[in-house]
């Protein structure tokens, strides 16, 4: 997890690439000399999480063996959870066993992965049980996301303030600030847009940055500009779930068909929340039709 101590941060660029969604760049530039054993484990975690973000679950599962350090075992568990949704109960059961083990249960990476998995499950109370104590920038940032999903902006703001006290310029602090500004809305949307604009000027453009700018544009009613940004993101990754989901919404607002983007999202990410909501709406419609028939 992100170090908060003094001294040179050998993983700064790798971490930054991961946070901003430049996953292949993170993987390609992960050979870093003279890392401490602890930093080497963190490096490997970031590389394997980048592979997970790219959908290469089986590579992660096969590469991390039983003798690997706890943080890597936790990352492997995330890959198993995402790769086989039908077996997620056994994965969650293993996760809970590890969290209950006093020798490893407080490991920062294990707590982070637990938070990510339980957030996927939309079990926010269980998520916070493991993440609320914070301790790393990654955990504080995850807490901001969780509280936003719970519509508790005031708690998200408290977590953000902790991050700002630690490092106001940290990429995760800036991202968390943008997420919160988007959630609050109103005049804060422009502030969020400026954060993503700043990222786009400092770093190579990624789907994450483009989607951030596009969501800001949509919230400000600039759907044509949002569509341009999202199509640029689609050119970078035709299967990126957030790009496809945002294109579905944007297409509806600009009067274009969203069926192709929705079909692609259903095929490549059947567990995505938008797919589930559309399927639920379709089921309700079918039931209503049957009642009328």
Curated annotation (Swiss-Prot):
One GO CC annotation: COPI-coated vesicle membrane
Keyword Transport on this protein? yes
Disulfide bridge partners, by residue number: none
Per the record, membrane topology reads: Peripheral membrane protein
A GO molecular function held by the record: structural molecule activity
Q: Does the keyword Hydrolase apply?
A: no
> What Gene3D superfamilies has UniProt attached to this entry?
Tetratricopeptide repeat domain (1.25.40.10)
Which SUPFAM superfamilies does this one have? Answer: TPR-like
Q: What is its main location?
A: cytoplasm
Which keywords does UniProt give here? Answer: Cytoplasm, Cytoplasmic vesicle, ER-Golgi transport, Golgi apparatus, Membrane, Protein transport, Transport
Q: Name one GO biological process term.
A: retrograde vesicle-mediated transport, Golgi to endoplasmic reticulum
Where does this polypeptide localize?
A: Cytoplasm; Golgi apparatus membrane; Cytoplasmic vesicle, COPI-coated vesicle membrane
Function, in words:
The coatomer is a cytosolic protein complex that binds to dilysine motifs and reversibly associates with Golgi non-clathrin-coated vesicles, which further mediate biosynthetic protein transport from the ER, via the Golgi up to the trans Golgi network. The coatomer complex is required for budding from Golgi membranes, and is essential for the retrograde Golgi-to-ER transport of dilysine-tagged proteins.
Q: Which PANTHER family match?
A: COATOMER SUBUNIT EPSILON
**Which family does the entry's similarity section mention?**
Belongs to the COPE family.
Subunit relationships: Oligomeric complex that consists of at least the alpha, beta, beta', gamma, delta, epsilon and zeta subunits.
Query: What is the name attached to this protein's record?
Result: Coatomer subunit epsilon-2
Organism of provenance: Arabidopsis thaliana (Mouse-ear cress)
